[in-house]
Design a protein with these regions (language model features):
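Bacterial N-terminal signal peptides
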Residues: 2-13
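A residue-level marker of the well-folded mature domains of exported/periplasmic proteins
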Residues: 11-352
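N-terminal export leaders
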Residues: 1-3, 22-23
Protein backbone atom coordinates (compact mmCIF):
# COMPACT_ATOMS: atom_id res chain seq x y z
CA UNK A 1 0.00 0.00 0.00
CA UNK A 2 2.86 2.31 0.90
CA UNK A 3 4.39 1.59 -2.52
CA UNK A 4 1.19 2.59 -4.29
CA UNK A 5 0.97 5.77 -2.23
CA UNK A 6 4.56 6.63 -3.05
CA UNK A 7 3.99 6.06 -6.78
CA UNK A 8 0.84 8.21 -6.64
CA UNK A 9 2.69 10.99 -4.79
CA UNK A 10 5.60 10.87 -7.25
CA UNK A 11 3.17 10.92 -10.17
CA UNK A 12 1.29 13.86 -8.65
CA UNK A 13 4.54 15.78 -8.15
CA UNK A 14 5.64 14.97 -11.71
CA UNK A 15 2.27 16.06 -13.11
CA UNK A 16 2.44 19.29 -11.13
CA UNK A 17 5.96 19.97 -12.42
CA UNK A 18 4.82 19.29 -15.99
CA UNK A 19 1.82 21.55 -15.50
CA UNK A 20 4.17 24.33 -14.42
CA UNK A 21 6.27 24.01 -17.59
CA UNK A 22 7.00 27.62 -18.50
CA UNK A 23 6.47 28.63 -22.12
CA UNK A 24 9.46 30.86 -22.82
CA UNK A 25 8.70 31.18 -26.53
CA UNK A 26 7.09 29.09 -29.27
CA UNK A 27 9.63 26.54 -30.48
CA UNK A 28 11.80 26.72 -27.34
CA UNK A 29 11.83 23.28 -25.69
CA UNK A 30 13.88 21.53 -22.97
CA UNK A 31 17.10 20.04 -24.36
CA UNK A 32 16.58 16.27 -24.79
CA UNK A 33 18.84 14.16 -22.60
CA UNK A 34 19.53 16.91 -20.04
CA UNK A 35 17.30 16.51 -17.01
CA UNK A 36 18.86 19.29 -14.91
CA UNK A 37 16.48 21.91 -13.52
CA UNK A 38 16.56 24.72 -11.00
CA UNK A 39 15.06 23.93 -7.59
CA UNK A 40 11.54 25.20 -6.84
CA UNK A 41 11.67 28.67 -5.22
CA UNK A 42 15.50 28.69 -5.56
CA UNK A 43 15.54 32.32 -6.76
CA UNK A 44 12.12 33.43 -5.52
CA UNK A 45 12.01 37.10 -4.52
CA UNK A 46 9.37 39.71 -3.93
CA UNK A 47 9.21 42.46 -6.53
CA UNK A 48 9.88 45.06 -7.72
CA UNK A 49 12.79 43.33 -9.44
CA UNK A 50 15.92 44.79 -10.96
CA UNK A 51 16.92 42.78 -14.05
CA UNK A 52 20.17 43.40 -15.92
CA UNK A 53 21.13 42.47 -19.46
CA UNK A 54 24.57 42.36 -21.06
CA UNK A 55 24.03 42.60 -24.84
CA UNK A 56 27.07 41.85 -27.02
CA UNK A 57 26.25 44.68 -29.45
CA UNK A 58 22.85 46.33 -29.86
CA UNK A 59 23.81 48.03 -33.12
CA UNK A 60 25.74 45.11 -34.62
CA UNK A 61 22.93 44.72 -37.19
CA UNK A 62 19.18 45.23 -37.57
CA UNK A 63 18.39 41.89 -35.85
CA UNK A 64 20.36 42.74 -32.70
CA UNK A 65 18.53 46.08 -32.48
CA UNK A 66 15.16 44.32 -32.55
CA UNK A 67 16.25 41.62 -30.09
CA UNK A 68 16.98 44.46 -27.63
CA UNK A 69 13.54 46.00 -28.37
CA UNK A 70 11.89 42.62 -27.72
CA UNK A 71 13.72 42.29 -24.38
CA UNK A 72 12.83 45.82 -23.26
CA UNK A 73 9.19 45.39 -24.28
CA UNK A 74 8.87 42.11 -22.34
CA UNK A 75 10.35 43.76 -19.23
CA UNK A 76 8.02 46.75 -19.57
CA UNK A 77 5.03 44.43 -19.87
CA UNK A 78 5.58 42.99 -16.38
CA UNK A 79 4.82 45.56 -13.70
CA UNK A 80 6.92 43.61 -11.16
CA UNK A 81 10.06 44.51 -13.14
CA UNK A 82 10.89 47.82 -11.46
CA UNK A 83 14.10 48.38 -13.41
CA UNK A 84 15.52 46.84 -16.57
CA UNK A 85 19.17 47.77 -17.13
CA UNK A 86 20.42 47.02 -20.65
CA UNK A 87 24.18 47.46 -21.09
CA UNK A 88 25.61 47.44 -24.61
CA UNK A 89 29.09 45.89 -25.04
CA UNK A 90 29.24 47.39 -28.54
CA UNK A 91 31.19 44.39 -29.95
CA UNK A 92 33.94 44.74 -27.32
CA UNK A 93 35.00 41.77 -25.19
CA UNK A 94 36.54 44.08 -22.57
CA UNK A 95 33.30 46.08 -22.36
CA UNK A 96 31.21 42.92 -21.93
CA UNK A 97 33.46 41.79 -19.05
CA UNK A 98 33.09 45.23 -17.40
CA UNK A 99 29.31 45.32 -18.03
CA UNK A 100 28.67 42.03 -16.26
CA UNK A 101 30.87 43.09 -13.32
CA UNK A 102 28.88 46.35 -13.19
CA UNK A 103 25.56 44.46 -13.04
CA UNK A 104 26.88 42.19 -10.26
CA UNK A 105 28.03 45.28 -8.33
CA UNK A 106 24.57 46.83 -8.77
CA UNK A 107 23.15 43.71 -7.07
CA UNK A 108 20.58 43.05 -9.77
CA UNK A 109 18.13 40.19 -9.14
CA UNK A 110 18.88 38.39 -12.43
CA UNK A 111 21.28 38.83 -15.36
CA UNK A 112 20.63 38.01 -19.01
CA UNK A 113 23.75 37.57 -21.16
CA UNK A 114 24.14 37.39 -24.92
CA UNK A 115 27.87 36.57 -25.27
CA UNK A 116 30.09 38.18 -27.89
CA UNK A 117 32.52 35.24 -28.07
CA UNK A 118 32.44 31.77 -26.46
CA UNK A 119 34.63 33.08 -23.59
CA UNK A 120 33.85 36.82 -23.31
CA UNK A 121 31.21 36.34 -20.60
CA UNK A 122 32.49 33.24 -18.77
CA UNK A 123 34.25 34.94 -15.83
CA UNK A 124 31.34 37.34 -15.32
CA UNK A 125 28.77 34.54 -15.40
CA UNK A 126 30.71 32.56 -12.80
CA UNK A 127 31.07 35.64 -10.59
CA UNK A 128 27.34 36.43 -10.80
CA UNK A 129 26.29 32.86 -10.00
CA UNK A 130 28.73 32.78 -7.06
CA UNK A 131 26.99 35.94 -5.78
CA UNK A 132 23.65 34.12 -5.92
CA UNK A 133 22.38 35.94 -9.03
CA UNK A 134 20.68 33.70 -11.62
CA UNK A 135 22.13 34.05 -15.13
CA UNK A 136 20.25 33.38 -18.36
CA UNK A 137 22.29 32.95 -21.56
CA UNK A 138 20.91 33.19 -25.10
CA UNK A 139 22.00 34.21 -28.63
CA UNK A 140 25.45 32.71 -28.31
CA UNK A 141 27.44 30.00 -26.59
CA UNK A 142 29.65 30.02 -23.52
CA UNK A 143 32.43 27.63 -22.60
CA UNK A 144 31.33 27.69 -18.96
CA UNK A 145 28.23 25.77 -17.91
CA UNK A 146 27.85 27.63 -14.62
CA UNK A 147 24.89 29.64 -15.99
CA UNK A 148 21.44 29.02 -14.50
CA UNK A 149 19.50 28.73 -17.78
CA UNK A 150 20.72 28.47 -21.38
CA UNK A 151 18.48 28.99 -24.44
CA UNK A 152 20.30 27.78 -27.54
CA UNK A 153 18.72 28.74 -30.84
CA UNK A 154 20.10 28.94 -34.32
CA UNK A 155 23.63 27.62 -34.40
CA UNK A 156 24.41 24.25 -35.93
CA UNK A 157 20.74 23.49 -36.64
CA UNK A 158 20.25 26.84 -38.42
CA UNK A 159 23.32 26.31 -40.60
CA UNK A 160 22.35 22.73 -41.39
CA UNK A 161 18.78 23.66 -42.41
CA UNK A 162 20.32 26.02 -45.00
CA UNK A 163 23.03 23.55 -46.03
CA UNK A 164 20.52 20.71 -46.48
CA UNK A 165 18.37 23.00 -48.62
CA UNK A 166 21.31 23.79 -50.94
CA UNK A 167 22.38 20.14 -51.18
CA UNK A 168 18.82 19.24 -52.21
CA UNK A 169 18.53 22.16 -54.66
CA UNK A 170 21.83 21.31 -56.33
CA UNK A 171 21.23 17.56 -56.41
CA UNK A 172 24.26 17.02 -54.17
CA UNK A 173 26.73 18.60 -56.58
CA UNK A 174 27.84 22.18 -57.27
CA UNK A 175 29.87 25.23 -56.30
CA UNK A 176 28.73 27.56 -53.55
CA UNK A 177 29.71 30.86 -51.98
CA UNK A 178 29.58 31.30 -48.22
CA UNK A 179 28.73 34.62 -46.57
CA UNK A 180 29.56 34.42 -42.89
CA UNK A 181 28.48 36.66 -40.01
CA UNK A 182 30.50 38.42 -37.33
CA UNK A 183 33.97 36.79 -37.07
CA UNK A 184 34.51 34.85 -33.78
CA UNK A 185 30.85 35.22 -32.74
CA UNK A 186 29.63 31.82 -31.43
CA UNK A 187 26.50 32.00 -33.59
CA UNK A 188 28.61 32.37 -36.74
CA UNK A 189 30.97 29.55 -35.72
CA UNK A 190 28.05 27.18 -35.15
CA UNK A 191 26.05 28.08 -38.24
CA UNK A 192 29.15 27.34 -40.31
CA UNK A 193 29.56 24.00 -38.50
CA UNK A 194 26.00 23.15 -39.53
CA UNK A 195 26.79 23.92 -43.17
CA UNK A 196 29.89 21.70 -43.12
CA UNK A 197 27.80 18.92 -41.58
CA UNK A 198 25.21 19.24 -44.37
CA UNK A 199 27.69 19.15 -47.28
CA UNK A 200 29.91 16.41 -45.82
CA UNK A 201 29.98 13.42 -48.17
CA UNK A 202 28.40 15.39 -51.04
CA UNK A 203 29.96 17.01 -54.10
CA UNK A 204 28.93 20.48 -52.99
CA UNK A 205 32.11 22.54 -52.76
CA UNK A 206 32.75 25.95 -51.16
CA UNK A 207 34.64 27.97 -53.79
CA UNK A 208 34.66 31.30 -51.91
CA UNK A 209 33.82 32.58 -48.44
CA UNK A 210 34.01 35.90 -46.64
CA UNK A 211 32.48 37.69 -43.64
CA UNK A 212 29.57 39.99 -44.47
CA UNK A 213 29.16 40.61 -40.71
CA UNK A 214 25.35 40.10 -40.92
CA UNK A 215 25.08 43.61 -42.45
CA UNK A 216 23.57 44.75 -45.75
CA UNK A 217 26.38 47.13 -46.76
CA UNK A 218 29.27 44.78 -45.93
CA UNK A 219 27.36 41.85 -47.47
CA UNK A 220 26.89 43.82 -50.67
CA UNK A 221 30.63 44.59 -50.94
CA UNK A 222 31.47 40.91 -50.37
CA UNK A 223 28.89 39.66 -52.87
CA UNK A 224 29.87 42.15 -55.54
CA UNK A 225 33.56 41.27 -55.16
CA UNK A 226 32.77 37.55 -55.44
CA UNK A 227 30.53 38.14 -58.47
CA UNK A 228 33.10 40.24 -60.32
CA UNK A 229 35.82 37.73 -59.50
CA UNK A 230 33.82 34.74 -60.79
CA UNK A 231 30.06 34.90 -61.42
CA UNK A 232 29.84 31.12 -62.01
CA UNK A 233 28.18 29.93 -58.81
CA UNK A 234 25.45 27.32 -58.29
CA UNK A 235 24.21 28.35 -54.84
CA UNK A 236 24.84 30.77 -51.98
CA UNK A 237 24.85 29.96 -48.27
CA UNK A 238 24.26 33.24 -46.45
CA UNK A 239 24.44 33.33 -42.66
CA UNK A 240 21.92 36.18 -42.41
CA UNK A 241 19.05 37.83 -44.28
CA UNK A 242 20.54 41.33 -44.60
CA UNK A 243 23.46 39.79 -46.51
CA UNK A 244 21.06 37.66 -48.58
CA UNK A 245 19.11 40.76 -49.58
CA UNK A 246 22.39 42.45 -50.54
CA UNK A 247 23.40 39.48 -52.71
CA UNK A 248 20.01 39.40 -54.43
CA UNK A 249 20.45 43.10 -55.23
CA UNK A 250 23.92 42.45 -56.70
CA UNK A 251 22.57 39.76 -59.06
CA UNK A 252 19.70 42.06 -60.03
CA UNK A 253 22.14 44.92 -60.64
CA UNK A 254 24.09 42.77 -63.11
CA UNK A 255 20.96 41.35 -64.72
CA UNK A 256 21.95 37.83 -63.69
CA UNK A 257 19.75 34.92 -62.64
CA UNK A 258 19.59 34.57 -58.86
CA UNK A 259 20.88 31.13 -57.82
CA UNK A 260 19.39 29.22 -54.86
CA UNK A 261 20.28 31.34 -51.83
CA UNK A 262 19.45 30.94 -48.15
CA UNK A 263 17.44 33.55 -46.26
CA UNK A 264 16.06 34.29 -42.79
CA UNK A 265 12.93 35.71 -41.14
CA UNK A 266 13.43 39.33 -42.17
CA UNK A 267 10.77 41.60 -43.70
CA UNK A 268 13.11 43.09 -46.31
CA UNK A 269 14.23 39.65 -47.41
CA UNK A 270 10.62 38.41 -47.53
CA UNK A 271 9.73 41.31 -49.86
CA UNK A 272 12.46 40.33 -52.35
CA UNK A 273 11.66 36.59 -52.08
CA UNK A 274 7.93 37.12 -52.68
CA UNK A 275 8.56 39.57 -55.55
CA UNK A 276 11.24 37.56 -57.38
CA UNK A 277 10.43 33.97 -56.39
CA UNK A 278 14.03 32.66 -56.40
CA UNK A 279 14.67 29.30 -54.63
CA UNK A 280 15.26 29.89 -50.91
CA UNK A 281 14.53 28.76 -47.38
CA UNK A 282 14.21 30.82 -44.22
CA UNK A 283 15.54 29.18 -41.06
CA UNK A 284 13.88 30.63 -37.96
CA UNK A 285 15.83 32.72 -35.45
CA UNK A 286 13.42 35.22 -33.96
CA UNK A 287 14.41 38.39 -32.10
CA UNK A 288 11.74 37.25 -29.65
CA UNK A 289 14.62 35.41 -27.97
CA UNK A 290 15.22 38.77 -26.26
CA UNK A 291 11.78 38.44 -24.67
CA UNK A 292 12.36 34.75 -23.88
CA UNK A 293 15.40 35.72 -21.78
CA UNK A 294 13.30 38.19 -19.77
CA UNK A 295 10.51 35.61 -19.35
CA UNK A 296 13.07 33.13 -17.99
CA UNK A 297 14.39 35.72 -15.49
CA UNK A 298 10.84 36.53 -14.34
CA UNK A 299 9.94 32.82 -13.99
CA UNK A 300 12.99 32.23 -11.77
CA UNK A 301 12.20 35.25 -9.59
CA UNK A 302 8.61 33.98 -9.28
CA UNK A 303 10.08 30.78 -7.85
CA UNK A 304 9.24 28.61 -10.84
CA UNK A 305 11.36 25.65 -11.85
CA UNK A 306 13.16 25.95 -15.18
CA UNK A 307 15.28 23.51 -17.14
CA UNK A 308 18.96 24.32 -17.20
CA UNK A 309 19.15 23.97 -20.97
CA UNK A 310 16.66 24.73 -23.72
CA UNK A 311 16.92 24.43 -27.48
CA UNK A 312 15.21 26.44 -30.20
CA UNK A 313 15.38 24.42 -33.40
CA UNK A 314 12.24 24.96 -35.51
CA UNK A 315 11.89 23.91 -39.13
CA UNK A 316 12.84 26.29 -41.91
CA UNK A 317 10.10 28.46 -43.44
CA UNK A 318 9.02 28.11 -47.05
CA UNK A 319 7.68 30.89 -49.29
CA UNK A 320 4.08 30.27 -48.19
CA UNK A 321 4.92 30.84 -44.53
CA UNK A 322 6.97 33.93 -45.43
CA UNK A 323 3.91 35.34 -47.23
CA UNK A 324 1.84 34.94 -44.04
CA UNK A 325 4.35 36.94 -41.97
CA UNK A 326 5.38 39.57 -44.52
CA UNK A 327 4.25 43.11 -43.66
CA UNK A 328 4.07 45.59 -46.52
CA UNK A 329 3.48 48.41 -44.01
CA UNK A 330 6.75 47.76 -42.12
CA UNK A 331 10.34 48.56 -43.11
CA UNK A 332 12.99 46.10 -44.27
CA UNK A 333 14.48 46.12 -40.75
CA UNK A 334 11.67 44.15 -39.04
CA UNK A 335 12.33 40.51 -38.10
CA UNK A 336 10.09 37.56 -37.24
CA UNK A 337 8.95 35.94 -35.04
CA UNK A 338 8.69 38.80 -32.58
CA UNK A 339 6.54 39.50 -29.53
CA UNK A 340 6.48 43.26 -30.08
CA UNK A 341 2.98 44.74 -29.91
CA UNK A 342 1.44 46.29 -33.02
CA UNK A 343 2.04 49.69 -31.42
CA UNK A 344 5.77 48.95 -30.97
CA UNK A 345 6.09 47.48 -34.48
CA UNK A 346 4.63 50.68 -35.93
CA UNK A 347 6.79 52.85 -33.64
CA UNK A 348 10.07 51.18 -34.65
CA UNK A 349 9.33 49.86 -38.14
CA UNK A 350 6.22 51.58 -39.48
CA UNK A 351 6.61 53.27 -42.87
CA UNK A 352 5.50 56.72 -41.76
Amino acid sequence: LLGIGLVAATLAAWTQARAQEVNLMNGVTPRPGDERTTAPNQFKKDGPWKIGMSHFGVNANTWTVQMAHDAEAAAKLDKRVGQFILLDANISQAKQVADIEDLVAQKVDAIIVTPLTPTSADAGIEKAVAAGIPVIVHTGLTETDKYTVDIQGGGVHFGKVMGDFLVKQLGGKGKIWVLRGLPAHPEDINRYKGLLEAIKGTDVKIIAEDAGKWQYDVGKQVCETLYLNNPQVDGIWSSGADMTRACVDVFQQYGAKIPPITGEGNNGFFARWIELGFPSISPEYGPEQGAAGVRAAVALLEGKQLHKRYIYEPEGWDLEKAKKYYRKDLSANAWFPTSLTEQDLQKYYGKH
